Amino acid sequence: MIDYTQYPDARGHFGIHGGRFVSETLMAALEDLENLYNRMKNDEQFLAEFDRDLAYYVGRPSPLYYAERWSKKLGGAQIYLKREDLNHTGSHKVNNTIGQALLAKLSGKKRIIAETGAGQHGVATATIAARLGLECVVFMGAEDVKRQAMNVYRMRLLGATVIPVQSGSKTLKDAMNEAMRDWVTNVDSTYYVIGTVAGPHPYPQLVRDFQSIIGREARRQIQEQAGRLPDALVACVGGGSNAIGLFYPFLNDQDVKMYGVEAAGHGIETGKHSAPLNAGHVGVLHGNRTYLMSDPQGQIIETHSISAGLDYPGVGPEHSFLKDMHRVEYVPIDDNEALQGFRDLTRIEGIIPAIESAHAMAYVTKLAPTMDKDQIIIANVSGRGDKDLMTVARIDGIEMVEM
């Protein structure tokens, strides 16, 4: 049996995926980061500071909530929700930014940069930068700046410089391109806080490790509440950090099924989606080999999702590996299904999820009725939906005005 905790290998590979495909300029910085992380990941003082920040600044552990009404309505499995939406800054993203900010501080760099799609990673990075007194620059696609005006204002309030990226599709991919360019130019003074389990090694590993607090807590909580492990885990996948954070501590438990939910946009058959694990090809993007949305010549094609946070043409290399190994099943949910998931959770449980998380909720409505009533699903509510109210209101034909 495969021991999934042994990945990545020493060169950052998950099977054929991962690795470090970057310019020579960045090699030394990545090797320094890898060496620093390898020293710190078992350092008692570093881990104690990380745990202290998660407890007293973020508010962890996040609750594991039994969604009783929703479970009864769907008539199948019992549904538990991991409430990452209740973290400080409103999503799972802060788990990673706290860890990386501590690494940045140890590396002596005073300037941090980040890319962001929905704005949640940008907000989390700007928040930690404010707390540590670091200069912060956030790159965000111009299209996403329009979609997520509230988060842009939050970042600026926190003291960050937000740079709208006008190139390409003006979304997350382009923001990451610009962040990488900035890093190449300013590598000696700047630490790049990558927001997901993508990018060159060691980022997929260290982001996973920081986010795995989600699954470690959920594992303990479900055993306390139900006396056993769950039968299924469900989480949305863009780059895939919230999903790998939930999945990783369960990967060696063969009886626990796992479902990663990709953004099918207007539908897989239309080509207007963000589902590389369902309809992509292996290629190299942002420093790692993984499944990508690309044409037959290997060129990246434009993606679409109602969700800015899932609107990305790649995916973390560990997810690509888990697909190849048939350990995780990756399923598509389109924009309309995600909107219904958003409405269902809001109306039935009084929890307004992020549109990203709503993709996972939509899949729960399909999965739960196919399971027995004594079975258990844990679904990750990766973020809260305040940032998406304008988007949903527009779809509903409601004009939001200032009071």
Swiss-Prot record:
Its cofactor is pyridoxal 5'-phosphate. Pfam families: PALP (PF00291). One of its GO terms (molecular function) is tryptophan synthase activity. Belongs to the TrpB family. The gene is trpB. One of its GO terms (cellular component) is cytoplasm. Keywords: Amino-acid biosynthesis, Aromatic amino acid biosynthesis, Lyase, Pyridoxal phosphate, Tryptophan biosynthesis. The beta subunit is responsible for the synthesis of L-tryptophan from indole and L-serine. It is an enzyme of class 4 (lyase). CDD domains: Trp-synth_B (cd06446). Transmembrane segments: none annotated. The modification N6-(pyridoxal phosphate)lysine is found at residue 93. InterPro entries: Trp_synth_b_CS, Trp_synth_beta, Trp_synth_beta/beta-like, TrpB-like_PALP, TrpB-like_PALP_sf. PROSITE patterns: TRP_SYNTHASE_BETA. Its EC number is 4.2.1.20. It comes from Acinetobacter calcoaceticus. Tetramer of two alpha and two beta chains. Pathway: Amino-acid biosynthesis; L-tryptophan biosynthesis; L-tryptophan from chorismate: step 5/5. It catalyses: (1S,2R)-1-C-(indol-3-yl)glycerol 3-phosphate + L-serine = D-glyceraldehyde 3-phosphate + L-tryptophan + H2O. This is Tryptophan synthase beta chain.
